[in-house]
């Protein structure tokens, strides 16, 4: 068995043990099946939801909202963070707002976005955009501020204008911190997505979790919860691979 296979087995062994404990605990009565249905029952419910198209339809709605909000937060947040780091007047103007809103629970904005834009996609996209923009902005800001002054002075001595220095020196220097901020935003997008859909939505995975829970179909509810967890995990793994390649390319 190769070293990579062994490392994967060791890494995911806790998940396998957790799944076994879940199944055995529910089957033997150690845990109430109302509180925690057997994992095999949850898997069967997941297959039924997939056959019925519920997972596909609601999953597509959720992924569209999360993707659109995250994309906007990356584009605007990255630009805003770099501009704040590069132009002091902009930093002085916007830093108090960033510092005030960053620690605020972003789920508190759910009623506000629903009031402004209703229960459709727009309110969810706005919520995810607002919530995810701040970690991206701070990542870009911290990365741009850490630019080596020697490189900046070198570019300036070679006649590079301010915009050229920004693009050739500051943006590449900001990339590692920016990518870390985007990873934080990626995780946050799933949290905000499900939270908003639980409260103010007519479709989506969060809505489906709430609907199934209210109807007492707990095996299907857990199936959707695990689906969200799996989507978040896969998205993070894919992003890590892309992030490593980008940093390797930069080096």
Language-model-derived ranges and their functions:
Residues 2-4, 28-74:
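Periplasmic/extracellular loop-to-transmembrane helix junction in inner-membrane transport proteins
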Residues 114-116, 144, 191-228, 247-251:
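Glycine-rich helix-loop "coupling/hinge" segments at transmembrane-helix boundaries
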Residues 126, 130, 162-196, 222, ...:
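Transmembrane alpha-helices
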Residues 1-16, 237-251:
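Transmembrane alpha-helical segments of polytopic membrane transport and secretion proteins
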Residues 88, 145, 176-180, 222-251:
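C-terminal transmembrane helix and the adjacent membrane-cytosol boundary/short C-terminal tail
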Residues 4, 75, 79-114, 138-142, ...:
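Cytoplasmic-entry segments and transmembrane alpha-helices of multi-pass inner-membrane transporters
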């Amino acid at each position: 068995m190769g070293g990579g296979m062994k490392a994967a087995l060791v890494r995911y062994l806790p998940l396998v043990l957790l799944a076994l404990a879940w199944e055995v605990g529910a089957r033997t009565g150690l845990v109430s099946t109302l509180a925690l249905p057997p994992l095999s029952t949850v898997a069967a419910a997941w297959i039924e939801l997939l056959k019925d198209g519920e997972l596909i339809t609601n999953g597509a709605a959720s992924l569209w909202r999360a993707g659109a909000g995250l994309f906007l937060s990356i584009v605007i947040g990255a630009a805003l963070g770099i501009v704040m780091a590069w132009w002091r007047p902009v930093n002085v103007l916007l830093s108090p707002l960033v510092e005030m809103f960053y620690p605020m629970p972003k789920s508190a904005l759910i009623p506000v976005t629903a009031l402004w834009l209703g229960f459709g996609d727009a309110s969810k996209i706005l919520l995810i955009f607002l919530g995810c923009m701040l970690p991206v902005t701070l990542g870009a800001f911290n990365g741009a501020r850490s630019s080596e002054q020697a490189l900046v002075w070198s570019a300036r001595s070679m006649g590079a204008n301010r915009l050229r220095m920004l693009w050739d020196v500051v943006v590449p220097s900001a990339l590692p911190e920016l990518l870390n901020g985007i990873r934080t935003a990626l995780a946050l997008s799933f949290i905000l997505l499900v939270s908003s859909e639980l409260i103010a939505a007519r479709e989506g995975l969060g809505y489906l979790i709430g609907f199934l829970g209210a109807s007492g179909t707990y095996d299907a509810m857990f199936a959707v919860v695990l689906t969200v967890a799996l989507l978040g995990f896969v998205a993070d793994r894919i992003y890590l691979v892309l992030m490593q390649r980008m940093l390797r390319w930069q080096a």
